Design a protein with these regions (language model features):
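Short, hinge-like loop/turn segments at secondary-structure boundaries
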Residues: 87-91, 132, 181-183
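Short, well-structured N-terminal submotif of metal-dependent ribonuclease cores
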Residues: 1-79, 83-102, 192
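Glycine-rich, flexible loop segments associated with nucleotide phosphate handling
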Residues: 38-41, 95-103, 139-154
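Acidic, glycine-rich loop-and-strand cores that form catalytic or ligand-binding grooves
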Residues: 104-108
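Active-site neighborhoods of divalent-metal-dependent phosphate/nucleic-acid chemistry enzymes
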Residues: 2-6, 27-28, 82-87, 111-162
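Phosphate- and divalent-cation-binding pockets in alpha/beta enzyme and binding domains
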Residues: 79, 123, 173
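Acidic, metal-binding active-site segment of PIN/NYN-like and related structure-specific nucleases
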Residues: 3, 146-193
C-alpha cells in the first residue's frame, strides 16, 4: 500500500483551503430527476442500498441504477455488513433483515467492487479534515462519516463516475473541495415504492 504525502498535499492543498463552506442552492446541484437514464457510470453511496431495501427509492434513482454502469465501494460494503454484528440475534426480525442484506451484497458484481488504496485513504483523511475545519464542525464530531464520504468521493473520481447519494449536504461540501467530483443527488421517496 503506497501513500505519497507530497503528492496528496500538492493535489488537495489542504492548508490553502481557507474559505468557509456554505451549502449551495439546490438549483445549483445535479439531481437524479434531471439526469438522462443513459450516461456515465455512477458509484452508489450506502443510502442508495438502504433506500432500495426499504422500498423508498424514487423512480429516477431506480432508472439510473437500472440503466447506468454501477460501481460499488468496499466502504459501503462495510457500512452494510455492520448490521451483521449490530443487530440483536434474539430480535424476531433480525434473520430476515440479514437475509435480505446478504442477498443485496451477493448481487454486487466483484469486478465493479472497488477498495480504496493507500493514496485514497491518506487523501481522504486530509479531505475530511479540511471539510471539518471549513464547515466549523466540533473536533471529532462526524469524523468517521465524513471520512467514509471522502473515500467514496475519491473512489467515484477514480472510476470516472458520479456519486449517487441523498447525502446532499456532505457531498455538496466535498464537491466544492474537489471540483472534478460529480454528484447526483436525490430525495428519498416516502411512498414506499418497490
Amino acid at each position: 500500500m503506497n501513500f505519497d504525502l507530497s503528492q496528496a498535499l500538492r493535489t488537495l492543498k489542504p492548508q490553502k483551503q481557507n474559505r468557509s463552506l456554505e451549502r449551495r442552492a439546490e438549483s445549483e446541484l445535479r439531481w437524479a430527476a434531471d439526469e438522462p437514464q443513459l450516461g456515465g457510470p455512477i458509484l452508489l453511496d450506502t443510502c442508495v442500498y438502504i433506500d432500495s431495501l426499504q422500498g423508498r427509492s424514487p423512480h429516477d434513482v431506480k432508472n439510473l441504477v437500472r440503466y447506468r454502469t454501477c460501481h460499488h465501494s468496499t466502504v459501503c460494503l462495510a457500512e452494510l455488513t455492520h448490521v451483521f454484528g449490530r443487530l440483536d440475534p434474539s430480535h424476531p426480525n433480525t434473520n430476515s433483515v440479514l437475509r435480505i442484506v446478504g442477498e443485496t451484497i451477493a448481487d454486487i458484481l466483484s469486478h465493479r467492487l472497488h477498495a480504496p488504496d493507500g493514496m485514497a485513504w491518506g487523501s481522504a483523511g486530509m479531505l475530511a479534515g479540511v471539510l471539518a475545519r471549513l464547515s466549523s464542525a466540533p473536533m471529532g464530531q462526524r469524523h468517521d462519516r465524513v471520512l467514509n464520504d471522502s473515500l467514496i468521493a475519491l473512489q467515484a473520481r477514480a472510476v470516472g463516475g458520479a456519486v449517487l447519494t441523498r447525502n446532499v449536504g456532505d457531498f455538496d461540501f466535498l464537491s466544492q473541495l474537489l471540483p472534478a467530483l460529480f454528484v447526483v443527488n436525490y430525495r428519498r421517496s416516502d411512498r414506499g415504492e418497490r
